[in-house]
């Protein structure tokens, strides 16, 4: 299948980076290369782009899309490791970093990846297919209490307790092997009147995907490491697609902008923690009405940007 991914908030994200033609930029989520191509258009031959992705299909697609550009370095890795990636490339500081945290259209549409609740496929959901933990492992081996917490915390699923119980009951008969089987279990666990609010499996699938790929843990560390790697006035632009991610970015940015831990009663700061960034987007940038109509998957997208000081 051809790797397809429509870049969300493309123009807004590129503008937010304030690109210098001889700068060094990192696309932490290369995908099909949509954002990267627009960055490269603004770079001279002295500029450089590092494209990171843990999905080999994405890297292959990006190489084809960006074949006319020679100033690209492709890295098959997780942006969790951005610090060591730049270390290995002997790059100290960069001028801008972008993270697009959405699952690509390709990953959702390719049934065998197991991300979609709309298609029956083996339970997988691994962004990096070289990793061991898959959705199958989570669904069939996690304790009921552990499943409940994942569905509640990562999916904000109001019926998380019941869904977890139904999963455990069903797997005692036979292992749950496909997305279709899991969807049926979820449908039975959620009362009919609540199934009118979008697809009943949406939140559960989100929660399991986040657990499989350790998305929230990765994000927290990656933000800190990215800021440390920015030159003065360098920008970090992050696109999120659900409230959990957006909350992490919002809170982490605030921590880095105002890190002082001194009690309010102290006349001066004595903790020694200095601000590292200035938040550019006091409120997140959202897609235009037109973009939401053209690309329904952009509807929940939010862009937050900060500048290194």
From Swiss-Prot:
Keywords noted in UniProt: Cytoplasm, Methyltransferase, rRNA processing, S-adenosyl-L-methionine, Transferase
SUPFAM superfamilies: Putative methyltransferase TM0872, insert domain, S-adenosyl-L-methionine-dependent methyltransferases
Predominant location category: cytoplasm
Pfam families tied to this protein: Methyltransf_5
Record's subcellular location: Cytoplasm
Residue numbers binding S-adenosyl-L-methionine: 33-35, 53, 79, 100, 107
GO MF, one example: rRNA (cytosine-N4-)-methyltransferase activity
Principal EC category: transferase
GO cellular component: cytoplasm
Matches recorded under InterPro entries: RsmH (IPR002903), SAM-dep_MeTrfase_MraW_recog (IPR023397), SAM-dependent_MTases_sf (IPR029063)
Enzyme Commission number: 2.1.1.199
Catalytic reaction equation(s): cytidine(1402) in 16S rRNA + S-adenosyl-L-methionine = N(4)-methylcytidine(1402) in 16S rRNA + S-adenosyl-L-homocysteine + H(+)
Role summary: Specifically methylates the N4 position of cytidine in position 1402 (C1402) of 16S rRNA.
Family indicated by similarity: Belongs to the methyltransferase superfamily. RsmH family.
Official protein name in the record: Ribosomal RNA small subunit methyltransferase H
Species of provenance: Clostridium botulinum (strain Kyoto / Type A2)
Gene from which the chain derives: rsmH
